[in-house]
Design a protein with these regions (language model features):
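Conserved small/polar residues in nucleotide/adenosyl-binding loops
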Residues: 1-5
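Switch I (effector-binding) loop of TRAFAC-class P-loop GTPase G-domains
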Residues: 6-30
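Amphipathic alpha-helical transducer elements in NTP-driven molecular machines
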Residues: 20, 50-54, 64, 81, ...
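Conserved active-site aspartate in kinases
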Residues: 36
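Flexible beta-alpha connector loops of hexameric P-loop NTPases
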Residues: 40-50, 77, 106-109
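Inter-motif core of Ras-like GTPase G domains
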Residues: 49-77, 89-101
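Conserved catalytic-core segment of NTP-binding enzymes
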Residues: 79-94, 114-120
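Canonical P-loop GTPase G-domain recognition
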Residues: 108-156
Length: 156
């Protein structure tokens, strides 16, 4: 996920999924790092590479003592894939309650937003108690809500 401020982009972005192939740490301030993990869903990578990413992500989630939140990015335009569901369930099994970032919100009509969010919730089998934030890198929709949530976590 790329959240930009007026000065810089914290994570490189690409039109092609699967470009992040390592764990990348971005120093935001003295209290906060943003950690970008490899994607899994639409990446054009072979099975061995995806398995390596899975192990890398699992090791990071198990070993990180400072991890406060996991954001799971899912394309709002589609029903959750089996990989999305597996990843959500796996993150929960590791003791985290992921925040769902419903990406590409600018690609659907505003009138379809709630319907698409309901499709995501149904597909993931989650209730309204799970935070889901519609997000667009293009329009910056959801950016402030994400930062507000991060700041709240940093204060706890």
């Amino acid at each position: 996920m790329c959240i930009r401020d007026s000065r810089k982009s914290y994570a490189r972005i690409s039109a092609q999924p699967g470009k992040t192939q390592t764990i990348n740490f971005y120093h935001i301030n003295d209290a906060l790092y943003y950690v970008d993990l490899p994607g899994y869903g639409y990446a054009r990578a072979n099975v061995e590479v995806k398995a390596k990413w899975g192990k890398m992500i699992e090791d990071y989630l198990h070993q990180s003592k400072m991890l406060r939140c996991v954001f799971l990015l899912i394309d709002i335009r589609h029903e959750p894939s089996s990989n999305d569901k597996l990843m959500y369930d796996w993150i929960v099994s590791q003791g985290y309650q992921p925040v769902i970032i419903a990406t590409k919100a600018d690609k659907i009509k505003r009138s379809q937003l709630q319907k698409q969010m309901k499709i995501l919730r149904t597909g993931l089998e989650i209730g309204t108690d799970v935070l889901m934030i519609p997000f667009s890198a293009e329009t910056k929709q959801g950016r402030e809500e994400i930062w507000d949530y991060i700041e709240k976590l940093a204060e706890e």
